[in-house]
Amino acid sequence: FYFDFIRENVNGDEHFWTSQAGSSIHTGWAGRAFERVCMQHVSQIKDALGFSAVVSSVHSWSYKGEKDPVSGKTIHKGAQIDLLIDRNDDTINLCEMKYTNAEYTITEEEDEKIRNRKEAFVRETETEKTVLLTMITSFGLTPGGYSNDIHCQLTMADLFR
């Protein structure tokens, strides 16, 4: 926050913060801040998903991807998952966290990224557990379209119950 919004305000402009609202810098910061809030509220996430009594562990996971050594073509794309909840009931919640000022719409491109993350995780970890796609958004998902592929949905309000 300091590097993006305090240090950059070298002239002491009292309207600097409001002038940055909606900018790519502000949007990026808000997304990172929302992810941090989610990470600090895992017990509320578990409760909202209905498995607070199930023993579980929280992880992140990443995979660099794989390229053909001869052609250099991508064999498997890389993937990063910021929040995995690995439950003792043979289920893993693969959590995507998205901050927006309204309902979040999953585009075709975003759907492909989410599916790639899940496929890479299952393939590389060789898990036999059920993997549930879980979206945590500020104001919910736009119904229909690619949101039908999401198993569990939570909103920011669920983090503060």
Residue ranges and their predicted role:
Residues Y2, L94-E96, I106, G145-N148:
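Short conserved micro-motifs at the rims of enzyme active sites and ligand-binding pockets
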